[in-house]
């Protein structure tokens, strides 16, 4: 490991490139916000866990539902989004020898819009005027300024997305007939999904604003919920697609191997983009007013995403085995010993991949009509969400940070920070596994989600939840230790680590891999296919919600 960390930069000069300084400042700004958000959101998560276990009574001026709303908003809309944009803008800078000046400017505009929007949403939460949780659909109503803040966040996403589109389109004009570099290809897929999935939630927010101001008396709840989940469902898979970019492209390079198949990688990206938005109704299986036929169609569309996930599992473990055997691995399973377990850049994403096995299985459970009836409004769902986001996605982001932060900062990963990263990885793994297990188990026993601690009049069933909730609090406490270690490592790598050139690791394709067909570059076709599937999934039910609208709801404030 020390040899890897102390490799002679001069001997690798042809493979290592310093990042454009102006692009580096932009990327560091995004990463700084991302990990500051992790610290704040993590502290709020600890308060939730301790309160939910009955250990901590929160004051009336900062209650559980304020904390829950802020925790979700900060980690879901801020931490992940800033990381994703900073990550892919760094990748495009690396792929294309620097960002175009206008694209860099658009990156800064997006940054400013998102920061402004974030501040506008947080202030009403702190004033206890927006405790509507991350799932901010009606009938609960926040301050209208909360929703106006969301508009700025969405517009910021659009600006960042179009910046990426301009960068890729310009390169393609100058390099006709060539394939877009694989990391930028992943980025294109992610930004396509971000743009199109945010359109429904933008429509929802513009429905809510006049209702929240009191200009109209009621709102169509079913329509608003459906528009939200067209976005919310896709957002989870945007994180997943971002994580898989590191799995496919970076991890093989860190192992000293190569990508198994460029064609398969691009087909997986296309599949995830085309099939993603259409599964929103599987979050609404228990909702009235939606026909069983529509629900089953969306369940099928949700389960279809499992196909590219299985392709990913096959490709990655084929890469692992092939590389490990090249490095001297022997036997049926003995080759695992040749994998770089002491390199945090590999270990954290690998554990994240393994965590996706139970996380994905839980998603299948929640897409199944009968099983969903049992777990839908229980802590099981929170456990599933923390496995998918907290383990699969965030741990991949952590692993990425140990080479990305040095790359954009012009510094080196030291053996000391690598060791801290290994400790952080295991602390986080144990903490999140403990908490997620407790959430799943107590959910099966009937403990509801989205509620503060209560014994429900010392009811025997509720008292039976306490051991699991205590386990939840223990897991949450370990997680905040992991957060502090991670933020410390990021600050060190960004400002205090020794100066040096760190490579943006991009694995080459195997020499004997088949040539990638150019139809994978026909993004116009894939976007049309995506829109056709979206139309199949949503036109009929949304028309039904509008033409045969249920009674509208006035705004409710339940806190």
Feature locations, PLM:
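Hydrophobic cores of alpha-helical transmembrane segments in multi-pass integral membrane proteins
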Residues: 3-13, 26-53, 62-99, 104-131, ...
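Membrane-interface helix termini and inter-helical loops of multi-pass transporters
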Residues: 57-58, 133-136, 287-291, 373-376
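Acidic/aromatic-lined carbohydrate-recognition and catalytic surfaces
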Residues: 139-140, 145
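Membrane-interfacial, low-structure loops and terminal tails that flank and connect transmembrane helices
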Residues: 4-20, 173-177, 323-342, 413-415, ...
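Non-transmembrane, amphipathic alpha-helical segments
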Residues: 18-21, 25-28
